[in-house]
Amino acid sequence: GLDRRNVLAFYRALGQTLESEGELALMAQLASLLGDGQGEVRIGKYAVARGFNLYEFAYPLQHLPKYDPLRDPVEEAMLFAIARQESEFNTEIVSRAGARGVLQVMQITARHVCRQYRIQCRIEDLLEDPSYNTRIASAYIADRRDEFGGSYILTLTGFNAGPGRTRQWLRQMGDPRRSAIDPFDWI
C-alpha cells in the first residue's frame, strides 16, 4: 500500500494547486469512493479555505462506522464533530499521546468502558475495528454527558482531557453553565 504521509502530501499539493472547484470536487469524490475519509476532509478543507463551496467534503457524513451502542448514544453530530477534528475519519491513526482510531480512544479509556459495561476489552480493535472504536467512544462520551449534566463544553473537555481535569478546571475557573461565566472565556 501507499505510505499515508505521501498520500496526504499529494492531497495537500492538489488542494493548493488545482484551479477549479470542479477539479477539487472530483479529487474529494475520488478520496471518498476509495474510503479515504481523511483525504476527503483534507481536500474539502483546502477547497473551503480557498473560497470554494465544497463544505460537503470538508464535513462529510458517510465515514462514521455503524456500531452497536452500549447505552443510549450521544448525538451522531457530536461523534461526527469529534471524528472530524481528532482523526479526520482516519481509522488507523495513533496520536502522539497514544489515542487510537477514528474517535481517538486512549487504551485506559477503553479498559474503563469495557470494565464498566462488562464487555471484552480488545485494545487492538481500537485500530482494527472502527465500529468497536466508535462503540467504546460513544459510551464514554455519553457517560461524560450525563456526568456533566448535558453540557457540550464539559462533555467534550471530559472526553478530551478526562473528567478529573474537567472537574479541576471547574474548581479553578468556575462553571460555564452559569450565566456569569462566558463559555468562550472558559474554553
What are these regions (language model features)?
Residues 2-187:
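Catalytic glycan-binding domains that act on GlcNAc-containing polysaccharides
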